[in-house]
């Protein structure tokens, strides 16, 4: 394929391109992702045709340069009616070009011209905007340059295609409905051209002279002030370099960036003749030189492309569609005709996945023609580039140059576009592969060959020149020089050459992350090396900055505002696949790092120059957090705006994790150095303590670099708009999590908006309107299932901790916002102080009894209680013009709160709305009554009456109503004998209705009687779903602790005789329900796929007077199946003494009762099943005849394997299973189902179930790898997606069955496939033969065509790998593997994060596989470290306390041996099996040569590593430490060749990542060290 590109085309079907229009010679921009409405700033020279139309020195419109004396714009820009003027004069108009920043008159190429003439189209219609076009002729002539160029004018037939992506630019309104909020800097955006039919659908009034452009979902558009500006579209049919044509002029539209309403543009091609008529020569050929070059071949084929010509351009695949793809290897060989010249290569746009050494994706540039990387001469490498910074220009040594582009298997970005041209051989060269003089406003350069080693005895010099008035800052992104005597060094001078003062000299690794500023506008950099050892060198980034005399007077310390607007509201914006934020739009966002070069770990928010607020859980497990990065946007790029600051101190809230998990999950970081505020580094505001949650109509966002999909962290800062979820709704969602009032929830459970790991500690901010500041309401704490559509994110509520923050961080350094409305918005004079000297009174809202409807209303009355011995009875009627909905209540309501003497707020009541209420308040404090209405269209009214009353008594010497956080109550006369005929009542009130109360009785002695019929105590838990009664209690047994909701009604009665000491009780208010261990007196919550619970004391007799509750919750979509392993309660015909009641759901509703059980009639075969995913079990015992109780087992079952009936009790198992064989459920992707007769006796029936996604096929192996030893009366029956009860009852037939198979495996099929996603296997045996056993292997397949090499499945011969070791934590969780290398030493990987006090070791295939071996000490290789998440020297040795006997060690490798038949070994994790598995998995491995491995992993491989490709799969993290063993043909012995260390980011994917091998530690490399340690 040969494609010839010509800058002038004369085809009737393609645009006529003149040689000097539509080009961007100074282009330095990245891909456009923003918008003008909330848009992204343009770069210098990115829109060289852009002009500004000023009237009386005020910019009112845009325009487009089309010639040296002509500007094209919209006619309505010079229409006096648009400005409500009688007339408008051209003498008051100006044209300005190359104006990037309106506040800076020194923009490169900026020129201002007076207007000579204005020509408005003769048929312009101001009502319809038809023919909205005008020509402006200027006085003088525009001088073209890098930042000033004309746009091309299309011909009459050159219509732009539907769907074409075009660019818009301007200084217009950046936020719709907030007019005159125009930016100072030129904005840009990318839009899509709509089809004519779509345009008419949005605007039926549009004419044929108009086109529409925008986004389908809105959010991107031009706006007021952009009028007259360009819609520039690229023409790329025959050229890789786009030439831009002016296809449209910004004209009109409905709103700005609204969904369904694109912008409307005057279609320029319809006026080409009209333009030519006035400009005459404009469309004629300008007789410019025509540049021609050819491209031969596909760059991504094996041979690559050849580019021939004196100048031209090319780009990476997919560049113009926005992104390259994975797994690319592309090559361009550039050849210029003049063999005496050099090639200068310039990147105009650049965006490649970043790594310090460009290990992932990169662009390599070589001098000369290179066939392939493997054969390339390292000396020819000019540089290897990645990241988002544009590299500086590169120079070849001769007339040819090679560019090689590689991408790995994941994370792709924009790509690049490059231009080249021939230059003279005497062009000044830096010695680093590029030009010597650097003039662009920012750029990147490196030592020659970087990241390969630089040359010996070399000199690299370059000088950087900034415009007058600017200075230069140089930052080293990477720096590593050889030698210890500074013979290799980088010297930096404050001037044009080395004769100027030297700023600094850097050597070894001194330059890493160092920023070097100049004091003038020039800087000279000199890199010199000696003839000894070399290293990788350096990579540097420079930029121009202000010299400190800036006139910017912005107060960046003002909290909650950003200098850059955020993206306009998006529907379903989310961090999980969410919106990329605009750089600088969230200036308080910071990134927490474990080290100055480490990856993002957690988020946080700036609250003052020296303080950061974040989540405590980010800090507790990472004591080495030492740095924060502020002003960051792209994690992979060192940006001008960002700064790294060390952390001096960490403060975790003292209540963190107190009482419940995730409580008080908040922490403060004090910085070692204060931050300097700027446009990208600013503080966020605090809410007032009164406003605990955002207002109903506030817009709220969460930001961060969290996971965009499972395990993929965002490269650029993302934002998501989240709705606040009501607390009670959040409680209903998180039924198995404990929440409290210190938390708030946000997210949309219907659309899956959420944050993920990595966003932890980040801000949840809200604002009331676009003119208001952003306020920090939440700190990202936790959630369930990243991006789940069912669970919102949970945030620490900041208002709960403001006092602590201010006290810790010093009130003078923290900015806070008290949310107050503009006083002019509300009714005045509605504040009143009421001193209650009379016993009763009233108050009312303005104009009562009429509803107040003249605007928003905020009223406040303070009621001062003069008589503290009385209670206040309040009755009020609150009228509301809207229905009583949660939304309406949040807008208009009444609240009552206690006011303490120190000015703080105590217990709060409300909000109340749309109802009549009667409240009895027993308070010793003053009260504040607040009436609030925040919407003018809502009418409200209030009438409140109050009356002082004597405090009501309980009858036992205390008040009847107890409203304290904690307290006591007791029987009358306690501790003396209580009175006869006592009648006492108490109401215990929680201060907040959603809190819980807990009662503990420390003394208890009442008359004992059957059913407590004489003296008794009853506790009633009053809930909105019904009352829950505890008791009655009597006798001398102290009842268990009782926990309930926010209101307890307590009754004590005594009869006329036999009075005792009585009782003493304490109560306390809790923020959340505690987890009861026994379930007695409260609720024990259980979850998971299976589990057990039992009555207290089981198998001994339970206690008297128990009330126990268990609530079981399993995953949504599953049901709870329950059976009792043992059951023994007191028996009665109606179960009226001791009983167990089973309910559907969390509450004990009679209509949801499944059954009531007692006595001995519950059998093992009885099955009880819920209709939903929640089941409740209540257990009660009376005062006598206590039995053994019960042991219950529950299992989560899918609806497809369960019955629909509520009560399963009649579905008995037909035969009792014996021998201790229990049902097992397998959910892993692969596993082994095994049985050994020696573990069981007698008749045995075992059920094994494999449950998986219905999209999977379950493959069951029956041959070769299977072990079947079944006798005549032994059988295995396989059922495909059949109800378990039907299997046991025998009402269905199996789909496959085999029996009596001993040594006849070849008669069976190789494997069986089942499509249902669920199979059950019923094994039956009479137990007569002691050698009955079997092993069956299964694996989940995507479809039936999937194939798997059997070598990667479980090994079928135990004992073959006796030296294989499993490493378990103290909780018996398997985390790593290892291998025995001597009688007391085990080798494994250092990345296992070993701690001797927490490791237990077993040998799965040893003589005693269950024995646990203790650890004496651990020796980690002294040079073990992580370099950019890649482990180096990943080896550790474990010494055992006792020597290993009867197990030979593995053979260590011999250097002279040649190995074949290599395998990696692994200990599997099997569901339903013992905690310590006794089986080893084996997978065959094809080892790779070291150079191939280096190329595959792109230089990440070091000499201590080996590579191998596992047949059919990859290792996962749980394989770490496992051995790579190979057999020697000479002696058939197995040799320990490698240790599983690391590999692809995503495992078990046989397609996308097949090119990348796994990486192992080379044991041979460390033989000397190993020998030294173990000897």
Curated annotation (Swiss-Prot):
All residue ranges annotated as the CUB domain in the record: 300-423, 432-545, 830-949, 956-1070, 1080-1197, 1221-1341
Active site: 76 (charge relay system), 132 (charge relay system), 227 (charge relay system), 617 (charge relay system), 665 (charge relay system), 760 (charge relay system)
GO biological process, alphabetically ordered: fertilization; oogenesis; proteolysis
Disulfide pairings: 61-77, 166-233, 199-212, 223-256, 300-330, 358-386, 432-460, 486-507, 602-618, 700-766, 730-745, 756-786, 830-859, 889-913, 956-984, 1012-1034, 1080-1108, 1135-1158, 1221-1246, 1376-1392, 1493-1507
Source taxon at top rank: Eukaryota
Location(s), subcellular: Secreted
Span of the signal peptide: 1-19
The keyword Repeat belongs to this UniProt entry's keyword annotation: yes
Molecular function (Gene Ontology), one example: serine-type endopeptidase activity
Keywords annotated in UniProt: Disulfide bond, Glycoprotein, Hydrolase, Protease, Repeat, Secreted, Serine protease, Signal
rRNA-binding as UniProt keyword: no
Glycosylation positions in this chain: 277, 303, 497, 513, 549, 748, 810, 968, 1027, 1087, 1090, 1273, 1511
Main function: May be responsible for elevation of the vitelline coat at the late developmental stage of oogenesis and during fertilization in ovarian eggs.
Protein name: Ovochymase
Protein species of origin: Halocynthia roretzi (Sea squirt)
């Amino acid at each position: 394929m040969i494609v010839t590109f010509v800058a002038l085309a004369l085809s009737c079907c393609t645009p006529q391109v003149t040689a000097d229009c539509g080009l961007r010679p100074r282009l330095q921009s990245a891909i456009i992702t923003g918008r003008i409405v909330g848009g992204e700033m343009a770069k210098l020279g990115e829109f060289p045709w852009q002009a500004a139309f000023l009237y009386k020195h005020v910019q009112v419109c845009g325009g487009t340069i089309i010639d040296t004396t002509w500007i094209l714009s919209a006619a309505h820009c010079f229409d006096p009616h648009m400005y409500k003027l009688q007339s408008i004069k051209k003498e008051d108009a100006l044209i300005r070009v190359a104006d990037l920043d309106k506040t800076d008159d020194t923009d490169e190429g900026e020129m201002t011209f007076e207007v000579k003439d204005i020509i408005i189209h003769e048929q312009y219609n101001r009502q319809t905007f038809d023919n909205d076009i005008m020509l402006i002729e200027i006085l003088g002539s525009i001088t073209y340059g890098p930042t000033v160029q004309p746009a091309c004018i299309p011909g009459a037939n050159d219509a732009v295609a539907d769907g074409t992506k075009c660019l818009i630019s301007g200084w217009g309104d950046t936020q719709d409905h907030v007019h005159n909020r125009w930016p100072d800097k030129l904005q840009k955006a990318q839009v899509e051209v709509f089809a004519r039919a779509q345009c008419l659908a949005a605007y039926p009034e549009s004419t044929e002279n108009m086109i529409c452009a925008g986004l389908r979902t809105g959010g991107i558009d031009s706006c007021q002030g952009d009028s007259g500006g360009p819609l520039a579209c690229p023409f790329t049919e025959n050229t890789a370099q786009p030439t831009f044509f002016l296809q449209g002029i910004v004209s009109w539209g409905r709103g700005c960036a609204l969904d369904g309403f694109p912008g409307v543009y005057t279609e320029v091609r319809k006026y080409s003749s009209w333009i030519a008529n006035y400009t005459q020569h404009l469309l004629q050929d300008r007789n410019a030189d025509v540049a021609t070059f050819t491209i031969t071949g596909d760059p991504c084929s094996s041979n690559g492309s050849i580019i021939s010509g004196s100048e031209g351009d090319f780009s990476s695949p997919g560049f113009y569609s926005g992104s390259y793809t994975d797994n690319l290897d592309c090559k361009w060989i550039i050849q210029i005709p003049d063999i005496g010249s050099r090639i200068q290569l310039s990147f105009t746009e650049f965006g490649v996945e970043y790594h310090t050494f460009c290990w992932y994706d990169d662009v390599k540039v070589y001098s000369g023609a290179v066939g392939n990387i493997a054969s390339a001469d390292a000396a020819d490498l000019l540089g290897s580039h990645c990241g988002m910074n544009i590299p500086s220009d590169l120079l070849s040594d001769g007339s040819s140059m090679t560019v090689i582009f590689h991408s790995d298997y994941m994370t792709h970005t924009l790509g690049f576009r490059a231009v080249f041209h021939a230059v003279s051989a005497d062009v000044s060269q830096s010695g680093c592969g590029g030009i010597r003089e650097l003039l662009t406003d920012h750029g990147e350069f490196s030592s020659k060959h970087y990241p390969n080693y630089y040359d010996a005895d070399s000199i690299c010099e370059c000088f950087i020149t900034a415009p007058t008035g600017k200075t230069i800052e140089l930052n080293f992104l990477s720096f590593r020089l050889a030698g210890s005597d500074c013979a290799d060094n980088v010297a930096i001078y404050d001037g044009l050459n080395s004769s100027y003062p030297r700023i600094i000299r850097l050597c070894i690794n001194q330059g890493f992350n160092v920023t070097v500023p100049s004091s003038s506008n020039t800087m000279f950099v000199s890199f010199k090396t000696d003839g000894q050892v070399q290293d990788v060198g350096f990579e540097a980034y420079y930029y121009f900055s202000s010299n400190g005399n800036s006139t910017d007077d912005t107060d960046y310390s003002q909290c909650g505002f950003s200098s850059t607007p955020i993206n306009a509201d998006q529907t379903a914006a989310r961090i999980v696949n969410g919106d990329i934020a605009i750089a600088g739009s969230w200036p308080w966002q910071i990134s927490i790092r474990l080290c100055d070069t480490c990856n993002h770990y957690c988020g946080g928010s700036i609250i003052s120059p020296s303080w950061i607020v974040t989540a405590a859980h980010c800090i507790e497990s990472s004591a080495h957090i030492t740095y924060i990065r502020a002003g960051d946007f792209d994690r992979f790029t060192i940006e001008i705006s960002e700064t790294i600051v060390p952390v001096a101190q960490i403060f975790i809230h003292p209540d963190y994790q107190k009482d419940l998990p995730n409580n008080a999950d908040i922490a403060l970081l004090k910085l070692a150095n204060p931050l300097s505020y700027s446009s990208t580094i600013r503080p966020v505001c605090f809410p007032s303590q009164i406003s605990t949650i955002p207002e109903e109509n506030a817009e709220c966002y969460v930001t961060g670099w969290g996971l965009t999909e499972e395990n993929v962290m965002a490269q650029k800062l993302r934002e998501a708009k989240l709705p606040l979820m009501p607390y009670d709704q959040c409680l209903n969602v998180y039924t198995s999590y404990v929440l409290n009032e210190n938390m708030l929830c946000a997210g949309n459970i219907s659309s899956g908006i959420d944050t993920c790991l990595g966003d932890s500690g980040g801000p949840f901010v809200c604002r009331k309107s676009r003119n208001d500041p952003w306020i920090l309401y939440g700190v990202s704490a936790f959630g369930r299932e990243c991006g789940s559509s069912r669970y919102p994110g949970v945030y620490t509520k900041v208002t709960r901790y403001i006092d602590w923050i201010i006290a810790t961080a010093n009130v003078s350094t923290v900015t806070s916002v008290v949310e107050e409305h503009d006083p002019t918005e509300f009714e005045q004079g509605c504040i009143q102080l009421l001193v209650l000297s009379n016993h009763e009174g009233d108050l009312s809202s303005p104009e009562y009894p009429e509803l107040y409807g003249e605007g928003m209303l905020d009223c406040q009355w303070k009621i001062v209680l003069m008589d503290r011995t009385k209670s206040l009875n309040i009755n009020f009627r609150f009228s509301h013009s809207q229905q009583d909905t949660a939304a309406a209540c949040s807008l208009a309501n009444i609240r009552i709160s206690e006011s303490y003497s120190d000015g703080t707020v105590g217990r709060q009541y409300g909000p109340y709305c749309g109802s009549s209420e009667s409240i009895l308040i027993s308070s010793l404090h003053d009260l504040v009554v607040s009436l609030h209405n925040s919407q003018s269209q809502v009418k409200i009214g209030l009438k409140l009456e109050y009356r002082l009353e004597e405090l009501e008594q309980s009858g036992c010497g205390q008040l009847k109503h107890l409203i304290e956080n904690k307290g006591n109550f007791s029987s009358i006369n306690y501790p003396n004998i209580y009175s006869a005929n006592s009648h006492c009542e108490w109401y215990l009130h929680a201060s907040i209705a959603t809190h819980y109360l807990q009662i503990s009785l420390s003394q208890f002695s009442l008359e004992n009687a059957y059913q407590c019929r004489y003296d008794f105590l009853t506790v009633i838990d009053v809930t909105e779903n019904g009352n829950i009664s505890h008791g009655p209690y009597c006798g001398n047994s102290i009842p268990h602790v009782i926990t309930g909701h926010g209101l307890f009604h307590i009754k004590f009665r005594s009869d006329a005789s036999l009075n005792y000491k009585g009782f003493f009780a304490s109560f306390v208010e809790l923020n959340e329900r505690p987890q009861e261990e026994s379930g007695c007196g409260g609720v024990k919550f259980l979850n998971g796929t299976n589990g057990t619970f039992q009555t207290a004391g089981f198998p001994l007799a339970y206690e008297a007077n128990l009330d126990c509750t268990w609530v079981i919750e399993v995953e949504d979509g599953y049901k709870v199946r329950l059976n009792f392993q043992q059951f023994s309660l007191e028996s009665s015909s109606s179960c009226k003494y001791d009983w167990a009641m089973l309910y559907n759901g969390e509450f004990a509703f009679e209509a949801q009762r499944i059954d009531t059980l007692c006595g001995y009639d519950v059998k093992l075969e009885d099955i009880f099943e819920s209709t939903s995913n929640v089941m409740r079990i209540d257990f009660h015992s009376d005062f006598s005849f206590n039995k053994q109780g019960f042991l219950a087992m529950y299992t989560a079952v899918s609806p497809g394997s369960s019955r629909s009936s509520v009560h399963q009790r009649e579905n008995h198992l037909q035969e009792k299973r014996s021998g201790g064989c229990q049902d097992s459920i397998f959910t892993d992707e692969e596993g082994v189902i095994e049985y050994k007769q020696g573990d069981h006796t007698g008749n045995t029936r075992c059920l094994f179930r494999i449950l998986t996604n219905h999209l999977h096929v379950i493959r069951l192996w029956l041959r070769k790898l299977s072990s079947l030893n079944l006798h005549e009366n032994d059988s295995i029956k396989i059922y495909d997606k059949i109800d378990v009860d039907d299997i046991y009852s025998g009402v269905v037939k199996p789909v496959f069955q085999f029996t009596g198979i001993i040594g006849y495996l070849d008669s069976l099929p190789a494997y069986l496939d089942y499509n249902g996603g669920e199979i059950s296997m019923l094994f039956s045996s009479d137990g007569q033969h002691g050698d009955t056993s079997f092993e069956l292997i299964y694996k989940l397949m995507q479809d039936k065509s999937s194939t798997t090499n059997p070598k990667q499945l479980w090994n079928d011969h135990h004992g073959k790998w006796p030296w294989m070791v499993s490493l378990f934590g103290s909780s018996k969780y398997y985390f790593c593997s290892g291998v025995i290398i001597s009688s007391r030493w085990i080798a494994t990987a250092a990345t296992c994060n070993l701690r001797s006090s927490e490791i237990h070791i077993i040998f799965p295939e040893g003589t005693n596989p269950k024995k646990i071996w203790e650890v004496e000490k651990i020796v980690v290789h002294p040079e073990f470290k992580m370099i950019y998440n890649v482990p180096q020297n990943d080896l550790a040795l474990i010494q055992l306390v006792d020597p290993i006997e009867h197990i030979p060690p593995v053979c260590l490798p011999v250097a002279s041996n040649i190995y074949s038949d290599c395998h990696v070994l692994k200990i599997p994790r099997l569901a339903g099996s013992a905690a310590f598995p006794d089986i080893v998995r084996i997978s065959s491995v094809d080892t790779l040569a070291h150079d191939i491995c280096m190329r595959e992993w792109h230089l990440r491989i070091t000499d201590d590593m080996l590579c191998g490709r596992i047949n059919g799969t990859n290792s996962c993290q749980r394989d770490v430490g496992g051995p790579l063993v190979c057999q020697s043909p000479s002696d058939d012995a197995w040799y320990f060749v490698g240790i599983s260390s690391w590999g692809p980011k995503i495992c078990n994917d046989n397609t996308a990542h097949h090119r990348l091998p796994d990486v192992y530690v080379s044991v041979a490399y460390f033989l000397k060290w190993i020998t030294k340690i173990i000897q």
